[in-house]
Protein backbone atom coordinates (compact mmCIF):
# COMPACT_ATOMS: atom_id res chain seq x y z
CA UNK A 1 0.00 0.00 0.00
CA UNK A 2 1.49 3.33 -1.00
CA UNK A 3 1.42 6.61 0.91
CA UNK A 4 -1.43 8.09 -1.12
CA UNK A 5 -3.66 5.09 -0.32
CA UNK A 6 -2.83 5.47 3.37
CA UNK A 7 -3.69 9.17 3.25
CA UNK A 8 -6.99 8.36 1.52
CA UNK A 9 -7.84 5.71 4.12
CA UNK A 10 -7.05 8.11 6.95
CA UNK A 11 -9.23 10.77 5.37
CA UNK A 12 -12.06 8.26 4.88
CA UNK A 13 -11.78 7.19 8.51
CA UNK A 14 -11.85 10.82 9.70
CA UNK A 15 -14.94 11.48 7.58
CA UNK A 16 -16.65 8.39 9.01
CA UNK A 17 -15.84 9.52 12.53
CA UNK A 18 -17.27 12.99 11.84
CA UNK A 19 -20.43 11.45 10.44
CA UNK A 20 -20.81 9.17 13.46
CA UNK A 21 -20.38 12.11 15.81
CA UNK A 22 -23.01 14.10 13.90
CA UNK A 23 -25.40 11.14 13.99
CA UNK A 24 -24.82 10.68 17.69
CA UNK A 25 -25.63 14.35 18.31
CA UNK A 26 -28.84 14.09 16.28
CA UNK A 27 -29.91 10.96 18.16
CA UNK A 28 -29.22 12.68 21.48
CA UNK A 29 -31.39 15.58 20.33
CA UNK A 30 -34.22 13.18 19.47
CA UNK A 31 -33.85 11.49 22.85
CA UNK A 32 -34.20 14.84 24.64
CA UNK A 33 -37.34 15.62 22.64
CA UNK A 34 -38.82 12.22 23.42
CA UNK A 35 -38.13 12.69 27.12
CA UNK A 36 -39.93 16.04 27.05
CA UNK A 37 -42.84 14.42 25.19
CA UNK A 38 -43.05 11.72 27.85
CA UNK A 39 -43.13 14.39 30.54
CA UNK A 40 -45.92 16.24 28.71
CA UNK A 41 -47.95 13.03 28.43
CA UNK A 42 -47.57 12.41 32.15
CA UNK A 43 -48.67 15.95 32.97
CA UNK A 44 -51.67 15.69 30.65
CA UNK A 45 -52.76 12.39 32.18
CA UNK A 46 -53.06 13.81 35.70
CA UNK A 47 -56.64 14.17 36.96
CA UNK A 48 -56.05 17.80 37.96
CA UNK A 49 -55.02 18.76 34.41
CA UNK A 50 -57.70 21.08 33.05
CA UNK A 51 -58.88 20.83 29.44
CA UNK A 52 -57.25 24.15 28.43
CA UNK A 53 -53.94 23.07 29.98
CA UNK A 54 -54.23 19.66 28.35
CA UNK A 55 -54.78 21.38 24.99
CA UNK A 56 -51.62 23.48 25.50
CA UNK A 57 -49.64 20.39 26.45
CA UNK A 58 -50.96 18.58 23.38
CA UNK A 59 -49.95 21.53 21.21
CA UNK A 60 -46.40 21.41 22.56
CA UNK A 61 -46.37 17.62 22.13
CA UNK A 62 -47.26 17.96 18.44
CA UNK A 63 -44.68 20.73 17.97
CA UNK A 64 -42.01 18.44 19.44
CA UNK A 65 -43.13 15.64 17.13
CA UNK A 66 -42.55 18.02 14.22
CA UNK A 67 -39.06 18.78 15.53
CA UNK A 68 -38.30 15.07 15.70
CA UNK A 69 -39.45 14.70 12.10
CA UNK A 70 -37.14 17.56 11.06
CA UNK A 71 -34.17 16.05 12.87
CA UNK A 72 -34.91 12.63 11.36
CA UNK A 73 -35.16 14.14 7.87
CA UNK A 74 -31.82 15.91 8.39
CA UNK A 75 -30.13 12.56 9.04
CA UNK A 76 -30.33 11.82 5.33
CA UNK A 77 -28.21 14.90 4.60
CA UNK A 78 -25.25 13.67 6.61
Describe each PLM feature range.
Residues 1-78:
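Amphipathic alpha-helical polymerization modules
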Amino acid sequence: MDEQELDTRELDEAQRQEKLQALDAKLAQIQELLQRMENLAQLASRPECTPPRRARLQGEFHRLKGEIDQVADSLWML
